[in-house]
Design a protein with these regions (language model features):
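A preference for well-ordered globular domain cores
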Residues: 1-69
């Protein structure tokens, strides 16, 4: 099956968003260490919101990025 240009762009954009999301998750891994001096619940909620990005209604065309605590 041949894909349209729009479908291909959507795939590329989706991968770009996932790459950014994964980078943000990796950068915030340290916040989940038991003795990290941060609000772990707030950071856990932020990290869950990052994981949920692909479930947003307009993904990948419009993405609302969560704000770091």
């Amino acid at each position: 099956m041949k894909r349209t240009q729009e479908e291909l762009q959507s795939i590329v954009y989706s991968e770009s968003i996932r790459t950014k999301r994964n980078k943000l998750l990796k950068e915030s891994d340290w916040t989940q260490v038991v003795d990290a001096p941060v609000d772990q619940a707030a950071w856990a909620a932020y990290r869950q919101a990052l994981r949920d990005i692909t479930s947003q209604a307009d993904f990948p065309n419009e993405v609302t990025w969560p704000t770091q605590p």
